């Protein structure tokens, strides 16, 4: 059994759960999600976050929309879908 692989899988699962919990509070863009995770003392970088967001979007757990930003290019805001809310409720019960 590869302990490093198990650690990576656990970390990924925890990050996915945390992302859903952040989005449960309201829509957010990637840098806000990273900031919230860092505030919770979780180490995460964009290269880790974007694949997780893409996977969760492909699973139907979240969606996104583009919004103009007064400080530069448009921002992609992520939000939970109903399926994502239901899935998060199941995760809350499991934890």
Where are the language model's segments positioned?
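N-terminal helix-turn-helix DNA-binding core of bacterial DNA-binding proteins
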Residues: 7-48, 67
């Amino acid at each position: 059994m590869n302990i490093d692989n198990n650690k990576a899988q656990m970390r990924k699962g925890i990050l996915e759960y945390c992302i859903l919990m952040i989005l449960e509070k309201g829509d957010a863009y990637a840098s806000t999600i990273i900031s919230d995770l860092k505030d919770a003392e979780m180490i995460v970088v964009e290269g880790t976050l974007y694949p997780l967001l893409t996977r969760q979007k492909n699973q139907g757990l979240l969606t996104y929309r583009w919004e103009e930003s007064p400080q530069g290019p448009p921002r992609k805001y992520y939000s939970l879908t109903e399926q994502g809310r239901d899935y998060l409720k199941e995760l809350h019960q499991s934890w």
